[in-house]
């Protein structure tokens, strides 16, 4: 139904980001990777969208690239994989690395995603490895960020990260490695970058 949204980035609210467009604030669920690459609050942004409609839920899911949206949709075709698990997978690394992990049958990377066990990782590989286009000549891409935390907003940041599917232990480790920052959004972004490496 929706292709994309352009609007003003208004911030993160635990389980979603908020984009304002035409005086309406849209709640958009997204991956840790997209959230980590959000601009500063008040800046303009464009996200590629899909809508999920269930009996008890209607939600928008937005991503920074068409490739990430396409991979999200492909992950949803895997038996037993829902939106939460797909976002969890897309939060551990960038799109190319995730596709490469699936094609090369790298279960170890897939099970780093909260909520993804060995059997689920094997099912993802089995159902998607022949359906993904990936350049196997390129090496694994990494974004390194050495990052310490301010205790003032530590709890809020931890809750936001846990709502993305990370364990309490993973969140605490990431937050310990983040520099003291002035805003919750920056702390979450930097923590996500740490968690994806």
UniProtKB/Swiss-Prot annotation:
Domain notes: Has three domains with a flexible linker between the domains II and III and assumes an 'L' shape. Domain III is highly mobile and contacts RuvB.
Main location: cytoplasm
Cellular component, GO, one term: Holliday junction helicase complex
UniProt subunit comment: Homotetramer. Forms an RuvA(8)-RuvB(12)-Holliday junction (HJ) complex. HJ DNA is sandwiched between 2 RuvA tetramers; dsDNA enters through RuvA and exits via RuvB. An RuvB hexamer assembles on each DNA strand where it exits the tetramer. Each RuvB hexamer is contacted by two RuvA subunits (via domain III) on 2 adjacent RuvB subunits; this complex drives branch migration. In the full resolvosome a probable DNA-RuvA(4)-RuvB(12)-RuvC(2) complex forms which resolves the HJ.
Family note: Belongs to the RuvA family.
Stretches for region Domain I: 1-64
Chain intervals for the UniProt region annotation (Domain III): 149-197
Superkingdom field: Bacteria
Protein name listed in UniProt: Holliday junction branch migration complex subunit RuvA
InterPro entries listed in its UniProt record: DNA_helicase_Holl-junc_RuvA_I, Hlx-hairpin-Hlx_DNA-bd_motif, NA-bd_OB-fold, RuvA, RuvA_2-like, RuvA_C, RuvA_C_sf
Compartments where located: Cytoplasm
Keyword Lyase in record: no
Region (Domain II): 65-143
Entry keyword annotation includes tRNA processing: no
Gene name for this UniProt entry: ruvA
Pfam families per UniProt: HHH_5, RuvA_C, RuvA_N
Region (Flexible linker): 144-149
GO BP of this protein: DNA recombination; DNA repair
Single GO term (MF): four-way junction helicase activity
Keywords, in A-Z order: Cytoplasm, DNA damage, DNA recombination, DNA repair, DNA-binding
